[in-house]
Amino acid sequence: KGFIRHLAAFGKNVLYLRLDLVTERMKVLTGMLPDPYFSFDQLDKLSTLAGIRYFILLGDYNKIDINIHHKSKEFRQLLRSLSDRYPVGIHPSSKSSNNTLQLIKERKRLEEITKKPIYDSRQHFLLLTMPGTYHALLEAGITDDYTMGFADNIGFRAGTAFPFYWFDL
């Protein structure tokens, strides 16, 4: 996170008298404690047990897409490191679910950072629209999508957990 976001979170913790969180945040920022939200080392250990695939959100920051800025040096280094060890795909932003140009922009950002072609996507379940999202994905060069679950039910939209080529009847 950037300075402004840390400052805002710090102020919120002070305002609500969450002194335990103020103390923890100060220790994390000064390096006295590890960041409790940085879980990539733990995921590395689990990678031998299960295939790990990362989907990266690189849209512009807004109310729905609260992500780290794509120009952050540390974030870019992390993404390069992850893409050297694991398959990496795009997690399209809320603004791109039916907007091909925005989706292409985000995919190109990830390709520029990782220096690898991006063909995989995982859309947020609540933002998936049929057939609009899939038309945008195909037009943007995305061939493999991992979104076919439901937001409010168990199961898969197509009745299968196996990959298949999406088609529009």
Segments predicted by a language model, with ranges:
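Aromatic-acidic/polar surface patches that form glycan- and anion
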Residues: 32, 36
